[in-house]
Amino acid sequence: MAYLPNRGDIVHLDFDPSSGREMKGPHFGLVLSGKVFNQQGLAMICPISQGAAAAAARTYGTVVTLVGAGTDTQGAVHCHQLKSLDWRAWNVSLKETVPQYIVDEALARIEAILFE
């Protein structure tokens, strides 16, 4: 059976095409939509950056750090760059799953962006 992304999965994908301050190229992303939505072929995914990009993004107040989360993937989840992507077309593959508190924190940041 083919992989179906689920909320809390860290996946590998390529964010091109993109423009402006959006993340470009191959990166990891955090899936925030659930399986029912994802079965339609789309998934809501926030890109994850590492290194200097992650440090700079922390000044936005819209990122969630993976440092100390117990994941192999480190860096910052960019909640301000949430994207709806056709995960089949982007050949998304599973890397690992984050603890629930990371998902909760990311969803809270997105809620603040949209409703505050």
Regions from the PLM with identified roles:
Residues M1-E116:
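Conserved functional hotspots at enzyme active or ligand-binding sites that engage polyanionic ligands
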